[in-house]
C-alpha cells in the first residue's frame, strides 16, 4: 500500500490494466458486484454528506469549525470505489462507438421483473436533493444499474451544493475529477445510445436512458449543472477542468444528446461565459479551452429546431469574430503585436479557432468553413508578424493542420480550391520568414523543428482530399492536392537532413508523407528537380539502413512505388538519373536482403521492391549474382548458391509486375532465405 501511495501520476493511467481487469471480473459476477459497490458507495456518500452538514451548521452559527477526522481516508475510499465502478459499468473506448457491456445489459434484464421504472425514476430524481443513500425509501424496486449511477449523482450533487455554499475548499479535487470521469464514461455508453450500434437494451435501461426518455433528459440537465458548478470553482485545477470539459463534450458529441442539451438554460450560460471571457472560464488551460469551444460549437450546430439555436450559435461565433477583428485589423497592429496583452489575446483566439475546427462534421461543415476561411487567410499575416515568436507561430500552423484535417474530405471543389490557396499562401510566407533559419548549428531540441513536423502533417492531410473526398462535385476546375503537396515538399526537402531524421516524431511523419506521395504521385516525384529528387532518394536510403522496422517498411514501399512506375511508364526511354537510381537501390536491397542481418517482418515490402528492381534491370542483377558467386572460396557453397539463385529467379522468369508474379517471387525469396541465408549473412 505504501508503494502505491508513493506513486505520482493519474491513478486511471497508472493502474489502467488492473482496473480494466477488476471491471471485467465484476461484470462476470454482476449480481454480487453491483449491490456490493452500491452499498459501499452509499455508505461513503452518507458519511461525506454528514460531515459537510456539520461544517455548514458550524459556519452558519458562527461557531469554530470543528476538526473533522478521517476526511483524507474517506476521499481515498470514494476515489477508488468510483474508479472500480466506472470500469465495471462501461469500457473506456478510443476511436470506436462506446457500448453498454453486454454483461451489464443482461444483469439489468434479469432484474426486470422486480424493477419498477417509476420507482427507479423517482429514486434517480431524488439524487438532486441529497442524502439519498441515507434515506428510508424502498429501493428494492429500483434497477440496480441505475441505483449505482444514482449514488454517483448524489455525490456530484453534494459537491454542487458545497460549491454553492462556499464550502468547496473542504472537497477533494481528485474525487471531483473522478466523479466527472465516471459520469462521462456513463454518458457516452448509456445516454441516448444509438440502437443501430448497441446490443438490445433491457426494458428498464431503455425506458430510463433511451432516446427521448424523461430520465435521459433529466440526466443531461443534471450533468450540465455539474459542469457549470465545476467550471465556476475548479477552472484553475487543470486535471479536473479537463475532465469536466470532456464531460461537457460527451453531452453534445451526438446529435440526439446535443438536441436535448441546447434546451437547457445552463448551456446558454456556458456559451455566454465563453463569449464574454469573464470569470473562471478565462483561467482554463489552453487545451481545455480548445475542447470547451469545440463542445459549445457542437451544441450550437445540432440539428434541433430550438428557437434559440441560431441566435446562440451566431452570437457565440460572432463574439470570436469580433474579438479577432478588433485585435488583428487595427491599423497599428504590427507595431502593437509584440505587447503581451495583444499577444495573449491572439494566442487565446487561435486556441478558440482550433476548437472550432475540431467541431467540424458533415452537418455543419459549410457554415464553419464560411466562418473559418477568412480567419485562415488572416492567420497567414499573423505568421508573418509573429515568425520570431514560436509560441504564436506554432499555433498558426496547428490551426491550419486542424482545419485542413477537419474540412478536406467534406468540401466542394470550389471550397477546396479556396482552402488550398490559403495553404499555398501559408507555405510561401513560411518560406520567406524561415529562409536560412534552419541549420545544424541551431539544432538543440526537437521542439525547434516542430514547425516542420506540422507542415508535414498539413501536407499529408491535403493529400487525403485526392484519396477520399466526400464533398459534392460542383464542376469547378480542380487545384490538385498533389501539386500543393509537392510544392510543400519543395520547401521541406532542403531542410531535411540525416541529423534531423534522428528525431523519432519528425522521422516517422516524414517517411509517412514520402511514402504517401510516392504511392499516389510517383510521376510527380520522378519529375522533381535534380537537387530535390536526390535529396529525397538519400533520405529513402537512410530509412533503409538506420531506422526501425516501421521506417524501413515505409522506405521499401516508397522505393517499390517509384520503381514500379519506372518499369511501367519510363523503361522505353529512361532518364539517366532513373537508371542510376535503379542500379543504386538494386545493389542496396540486394545486400540488405541477402548479405546483411535482415528482419523477416520486412519480407513482404522488401520482396515487392526487390522484384520491381530486378525486372527493371535484370542485367545488373545478374552482375551482382556473379560477383557474389565469384567471391565464394568454397566450391560447395558456390554451387549451392547457384542453385538457390536459379530457383529465386529462374531463366524463364516473366518480367512482369502483375499480382501473380509478385506472389511467386515472394515465395521464391522466402525459400531462398530459408535455404542459404545462414551462411550468406555477414554479421
Model-identified regions with their sequence ranges:
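Karyopherin-beta/Importin-beta family HEAT-repeat alpha-solenoid scaffold
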Residues: 1-683
Amino acid at each position: 500500500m505504501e508503494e502505491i501511495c508513493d506513486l505520482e501520476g493519474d491513478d486511471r493511467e497508472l493502474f489502467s490494466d488492473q482496473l480494466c481487469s477488476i471491471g471485467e471480473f465484476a461484470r462476470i459476477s454482476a449480481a454480487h458486484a453491483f449491490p456490493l459497490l452500491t452499498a459501499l458507495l452509499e455508505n461513503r456518500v452518507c458519511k461525506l454528506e454528514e460531515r459537510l452538514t456539520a461544517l455548514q451548521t458550524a459556519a452558519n452559527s458562527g461557531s469554530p469549525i470543528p476538526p473533522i477526522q478521517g476526511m483524507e481516508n474517506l476521499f481515498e475510499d470514494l476515489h477508488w470505489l468510483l474508479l472500480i465502478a466506472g470500469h465495471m459499468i462501461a469500457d473506456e473506448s478510443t476511436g470506436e462507438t462506446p457500448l453498454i457491456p453486454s454483461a451489464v445489459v443482461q444483469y439489468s434484464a434479469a432484474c426486470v421483473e422486480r424493477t419498477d421504472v417509476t420507482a427507479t425514476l423517482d429514486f434517480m430524481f431524488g439524487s438532486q436533493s441529497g442524502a439519498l443513500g441515507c434515506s428510508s425509501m424502498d429501493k428494492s424496486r429500483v434497477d440496480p444499474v441505475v441505483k449505482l449511477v444514482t449514488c454517483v449523482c448524489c455525490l456530484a450533487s453534494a459537491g454542487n451544493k458545497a460549491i454553492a455554499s462556499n464550502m468547496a475548499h473542504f472537497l477533494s479535487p481528485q474525487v471531483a475529477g473522478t466523479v466527472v470521469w465516471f459520469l462521462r464514461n456513463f454518458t457516452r455508453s448509456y445516454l441516448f445510445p444509438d440502437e443501430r450500434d448497441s446490443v438490445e437494451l433491457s426494458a428498464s435501461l431503455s425506458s430510463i436512458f433511451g432516446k427521448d426518455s424523461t430520465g435521459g433528459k433529466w440526466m443531461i440537465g443534471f450533468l450540465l449543472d455539474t459542469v457549470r458548478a465545476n467550471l465556476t470553482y475548479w477552472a484553475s485545477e487543470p486535471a479536473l477542468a479537463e475532465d469536466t470539459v470532456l464531460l461537457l463534450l460527451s453531452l453534445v458529441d451526438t446529435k440526439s444528446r446535443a438536441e436535448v442539451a441546447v434546451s437547457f438554460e445552463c448551456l446558454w450560460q456556458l456559451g455566454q461565459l465563453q463569449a464574454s471571457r469573464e470569470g473562471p472560464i478565462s483561467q482554463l488551460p489552453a487545451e481545455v479551452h480548445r475542447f470547451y469551444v469545440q463542445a459549445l460549437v457542437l451544441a450550437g450546430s445540432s440539428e434541433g429546431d430550438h428557437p434559440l439555436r441560431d441566435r446562440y450559435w451566431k452570437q457565440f461565433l460572432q463574439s470570436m469574430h469580433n474579438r479577432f477583428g478588433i485585435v488583428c485589423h487595427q491599423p497599428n497592429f504590427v507595431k502593437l503585436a509584440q505587447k503581451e496583452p495583444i499577444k495573449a489575446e491572439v494566442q487565446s483566439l487561435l486556441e478558440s479557432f482550433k476548437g472550432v475546427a475540431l467541431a467540424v462534421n458533415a452537418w455543419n461543415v459549410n457554415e464553419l468553413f464560411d466562418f473559418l476561411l477568412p480567419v485562415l487567410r488572416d492567420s497567414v499575416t499573423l505568421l508573418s508578424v509573429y515568425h520570431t515568436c514560436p509560441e504564436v507561430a506554432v499555433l498558426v500552423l496547428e490551426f491550419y493542420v486542424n482545419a485542413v484535417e477537419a474540412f478536406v474530405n467534406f468540401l466542394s471543389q470550389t471550397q477546396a480550391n479556396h482552402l488550398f490557396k490559403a495553404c499555398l499562401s501559408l507555405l510561401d510566407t513560411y518560406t520567406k520568414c524561415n529562409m536560412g533559419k534552419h541549420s545544424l548549428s541551431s539544432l538543440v531540441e526537437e521542439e525547434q523543428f516542430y514547425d516542420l513536423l506540422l507542415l508535414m502533417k498539413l501536407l499529408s492531410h491535403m493529400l487525403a482530399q485526392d484519396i477520399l473526398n466526400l464533398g459534392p462535385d460542383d464542376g469547378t476546375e480542380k487545384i490538385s492536392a498533389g501539386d500543393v503537396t509537392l510544392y510543400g515538399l519543395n520547401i521541406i526537402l532542403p531542410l531535411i537532413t540525416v541529423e534531423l531524421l534522428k528525431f523519432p516524431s519528425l522521422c516517422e511523419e516524414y517517411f509517412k508523407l514520402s511514402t504517401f506521395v510516392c504511392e499516389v504521385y510517383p510521376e510527380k516525384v520522378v519529375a522533381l528537380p535534380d537537387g530535390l529528387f536526390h535529396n529525397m532518394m538519400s533520405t529513402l536510403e537512410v530509412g533503409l539502413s538506420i531506422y526501425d522496422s516501421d521506417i524501413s517498411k515505409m522506405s521499401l514501399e516508397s522505393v517499390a512505388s517509384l520503381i514500379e512506375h519506372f518499369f511501367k511508364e519510363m523503361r522505353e526511354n529512361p532518364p539517366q538519373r532513373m537508371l542510376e537510381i535503379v542500379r543504386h537501390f538494386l545493389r542496396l536491397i540486394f545486400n540488405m536482403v541477402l548479405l546483411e542481418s535482415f528482419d523477416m517482418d520486412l519480407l513482404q515490402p522488401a520482396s515487392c521492391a526487390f522484384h520491381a528492381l530486378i525486372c527493371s534491370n535484370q542485367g545488373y542483377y545478374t552482375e551482382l549474382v556473379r560477383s557474389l558467386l565469384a567471391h565464394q572460396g568454397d566450391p560447395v557453397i558456390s554451387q549451392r548458391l547457384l542453385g538457390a539463385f536459379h530457383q529465386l529467379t529462374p531463366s524463364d522468369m516473366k518480367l512482369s509486375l502483375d499480382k501473380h508474379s509478385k506472389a511467386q517471387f515472394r515465395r521464391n525469396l522466402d525459400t531462398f532465405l530459408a535455404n542459404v541465408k545462414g551462411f550468406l549473412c555477414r554479421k
